[in-house]
């Protein structure tokens, strides 16, 4: 019997359990990615894309990228797994630098991620630089 991937289940899964689902195959990984995506709110006019193969490098069982229409940067939410034992929200400039972990979560906290996304969208709309957005998100988000 398959476990339904509810928010509670996502919040209690270990890094190894995320890796086990990834190893189970592409259908299971897609289901896991979609379960995470359902819990998140992308800002208006931003795209939300999940990784299903290795489009974004394939380092994490779940990676969801949020990108504003201008595509100058991405915010990537990465699940626990072999690379990291915690959830991380990373801001990546389109050119690759600056790059920074702007939020770390011991357990999946979609409200904190959605808040950081909304804040980034607001700062971006106000004309803040990518570097300034990184610093503000790091000060605001930190550890959840």
Swiss-Prot record:
Pfam families: PsiB. InterPro entries: Plasmid_inh_PsiB, PsiB-like_sf. It comes from the Bacteria. Keywords: Plasmid. The keyword Phosphoprotein does not apply. Inhibition of the induction of the SOS pathway. To PsiB protein of plasmid F. This is Protein PsiB. It comes from Escherichia coli.
């Amino acid at each position: 019997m398959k476990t339904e991937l509810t928010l509670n289940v996502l919040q209690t899964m270990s890094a190894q359990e995320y890796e086990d689902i990834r190893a189970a195959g592409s259908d299971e990984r897609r289901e896991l990615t979609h379960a995470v995506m359902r819990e998140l709110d992308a800002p208006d006019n931003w795209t939300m894309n999940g990784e299903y193969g290795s489009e974004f490098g394939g380092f994490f069982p779940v990676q969801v990228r949020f990108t504003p229409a201008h595509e100058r940067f991405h915010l990537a939410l990465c699940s626990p797994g072999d690379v990291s034992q915690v959830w991380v929200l990373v801001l990546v400039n389109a050119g690759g630098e600056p790059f920074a972990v702007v939020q770390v979560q011991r357990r999946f906290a979609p409200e904190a991620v959605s808040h950081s996304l909304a804040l980034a969208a607001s700062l971006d709309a106000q004309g803040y630089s990518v570097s300034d957005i990184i610093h503000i998100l790091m000060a605001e988000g930190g550890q959840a």
